[in-house]
A protein has these predicted regions:
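A compositional/structural signature for long, glycine/proline-rich flexible linkers
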Residues: 1-242
Length: 242
């Protein structure tokens, strides 16, 4: 897969581009913490696959897993900035290296569990631990820090078991809701915009109440480097609407 990240003129605008494998290990992380906002041309290859002819000027990134998550978060400064933020978004390029191999589907194949596998493995306690690990990325935003402060997540020693019982239940039910939404997804709700495939669905009560998306354009897709297929994941707009 090809990923081209544009250079941002505004170096204060938050940008995070992550590629994670199916075990959520980091394959690539670029953004405002990197030189030139991580701008550049990248080619994501499966294991020891050779860089194809004509792509020698691309930076090779290798993944041990065939299925990977591509996630982009781009900050906007409110409604008056949406036009500029969307124009930046349109400069991103993500496309299959061999698009002629891709066969379009009206729905996901029977037995598909690409996303649900990880959700059934990750427990709520692990979710809280990972959420605590995002503090460094959200220190610039007082809204998110306020949420985390209310949940006592700024204390690295704090654990899921110490949350009030009603919050533990909301998190657990949110996991179940999210899993069922994935398992019941027909594929017909999908759409394509500038090469990004997405779908719209419920993320559960916990996700609706506590998931931080305000003023962040959020895109995620799951391409398969081995079979040249792509599965829909999630998209939100700058107001956090899924």
């Amino acid at each position: 897969y090809i990923l081209e990240i544009p250079r941002l003129e505004d170096d204060k605008r938050y940008l995070l581009v992550n590629i994670l494998n199916l075990k959520t290990e980091m394959v690539l992380s670029k953004g405002t913490k990197n030189k030139d906002n991580g701008a550049g041309k990248y080619i994501i290859l499966y294991r020891d696959e050779k860089v194809p002819e004509g792509y020698e000027d691309y930076i090779p990134i290798r993944s041990e897993d065939s299925r990977n998550y591509f996630i982009i978060r781009l900050e906007s400064y409110g409604e008056n900035d949406y036009g500029k933020a969307n124009a930046i978004q349109d400069q991103f390029v993500m496309r299959a290296l061999y698009p002629e191999r891709i066969v379009e589907r009206e729905s996901l194949p029977d037995g598909y569990n690409g996303q649900s596998y990880f959700m059934t493995q990750m427990k709520p306690a692990e979710f809280i631990r990972r959420l605590q690990g995002t503090i460094a990325d959200t220190r610039h935003d007082e809204t998110m820090l306020t949420y985390m402060r209310q949940l006592r997540l700024l204390d690295p020693a704090f654990s899921y078991e110490e949350l009030p019982e009603h919050l533990q239940k909301e998190i657990a039910s949110g996991f179940e809701d999210g899993l069922q939404a994935i398992l019941q997804y027909s594929g017909t709700e999908g759409y394509e915009s500038n090469g990004w495939h997405a779908y719209i669905d419920s993320v559960g009560e916990y996700g609706r109440k506590y998931r931080y998306r305000a003023h962040i354009n959020y895109f995620a897709v799951m391409p398969n480097l081995y079979s040249d297929t792509i599965s829909p994941n999630l998209e939100t707009d700058s107001d956090g609407n899924v």
